[in-house]
């Protein structure tokens, strides 16, 4: 059995401006974070082989969890340091495909972010959460941060505003785009052999989910094309086991919260590169539906509840070897997300985001929206297996709230009000080196 050691280091400086305050943090770029891995395989006979993969992620600081009070992003200590990304074995047959078992990527992992260019390592066009979306929301009315967080905490395990709304909470509550699968599942997965550029895969994992995906790679007419579509369903279980966030949970009994979930999602993406000119286009989209949201006590008696989420994103530019060092990438991008209600979060009547600070009730999240406009440049250095990059993103957010009958509980039967949020500007510059 062979052994190959591989990995990468991806560290950056991240500048942010939330409309009132700005700063620069040194972070691990979570678009493709620092990691080290071990993999190997061995032939059993002419048609069969077996192998394994173990991969460990490394974060010195977390680019998607840092906030105005916490440069490292370690409000949850598990968000920095080491984490297990892969630990599985596989058996593969040339004619019938492969089966793998253990902690690994699901069939739909990265299905909405297929990308043949250098931007996949530092500015994923559809997974915008990874660049600065741990920042707390700042009210555009009073200039204060959500959760009234104004001074550092003395706690070793939390920072002020940990219970407040961050940018990522506006994207399906967890920050992952609708339609996208995940890594770090305990699952069994089947992958078919390639037929005319197409491969199919399916996975099932605890507790419980399953998904299906179809991918294509090929070249024709001077274009390199990579594309994929996938469908996934969470049928039961606690979200910390499945890693998929459904915004609603089932009620075991009226007024009693349960950890059960049930949602399904569909997504896909395509990446096209014109080999002669280097012009490229990456595009992705996805939708998620939450079957339990309308069964929540908060929304069960309320008309007009939206239990869906959707997004689309596009990135286009040119990637070509203009100099002897390696490829240069210049691009622009746009991302748009629209989401419905959320039963996991509330805004208190005294919060900075409250539309009516004098109200006797809190607020339910009725709808969210995120728009991102971005651009960037990167330079590859082939001899060093390194890419230097600079990316910029301007983030505009929408937050709509609906009054609760109680401060933090009861049906959302009150008025619908907007909660204006300050725009955010984000700049990331750094390098990734692979080995």
Question: Where does each model-flagged region fall?
Answer:
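Outer membrane beta-barrel
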Residues: 2-14, 24-211, 215-221
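Outer-membrane beta-barrel proteins
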Residues: 16-20, 61-65, 110-113, 236-240, ...
